[in-house]
Amino acid sequence: MVRVTFLGHSAFLLEGSKRVLIDPWIEGNPQSPIKIEECKGADVYIVTHDHGDHGLEDAIKLSKRHGGTVVSIYEIAEEARRKGANSLGANIGSFFEVNGVKVVLTKALHSSNLGAPVGAVIELDGKRVYHAGDTGVFYDMKIIGELYKPDLALLPIGGHFVMGPLEASLAIELLGVSKVIPMHYQTFPVLKGKPEELKEHLGRRGIKAEIIALKPGESYEL
C-alpha cells in the first residue's frame, strides 16, 4: 500500500516502505497544509523543473536538514549539489534506482530556468505513480502509458501555463490510466480549471476514470 498525500499545488508525498516528496513547494505555497519546519523530509525529493512554485529550494533545505536525495534533470541536480544537498542527476530515458525507489523521468511540454522540464514515473512497493509535472498534452503520453502502465496519474488541470480540463481529458485517454488526482489548479486566479470540468469532458469522451479530487492535506491509499 502506498499513501499519496496532496500538499497543495503540485506537491505530493508518497509513503510506503520509503518516503518520496514530489515538487515540494512548501514555503510560500498558499495551499500548503504544513510548514517546512513540520516536514519530516524524505528518502527522495523529485523536482520536475526549475520554477519557483515547484520546490527546488525547499527540496535542497529538506535534504540538507533530514537527508535524502534530490532527483531531477542533470542541470537542476547539479545546482542542488552546488548548494550542499545530496543529489542525483538524470535525463529522460529509463528506470534508475535511488535509495530504494525506482524512478524514470519522462517528457513534459513546459519551460524551466535550468535544464529541461520533465515528468516522472515513480515505482514504490509495486505501485507506479505518474506525476506529469507542468505540461501541455502531447501524443507521447500514449507511450508513457504503454511502457510504464501507471496505477495512478497526477495531472495538472489549471490551464494557462499547463493543461486545462479539456486537454487533461485527452491525456487520460492517451495514458489509459484509471485513477487520476488533479493538481496545479486554483492556486492562483489564472489556474481556473476544476475537477468537475474534467469529469464533464471525460463523460463527453466516453472515458471511464476515477477522478480523486483531494484537498490539501488529504490522502489516498493506492
Swiss-Prot record:
Domain of life where this protein originates: Archaea
Record's keyword terms, sorted: Hydrolase
SUPFAM superfamilies: Metallo-hydrolase/oxidoreductase
GO molecular-function terms, A-Z: hydrolase activity
InterPro entries: Metallo-B-lactamas, RibonucZ/Hydroxyglut_hydro, UPF0173, UPF0173_UPF0282_UlaG_hydrolase
Family: Belongs to the UPF0173 family.
PANTHER family tied to this protein: UPF0173 METAL-DEPENDENT HYDROLASE MJ1163, UPF0173 METAL-DEPENDENT HYDROLASE MJ1163-RELATED
Record-given protein name: UPF0173 metal-dependent hydrolase Kcr_0055
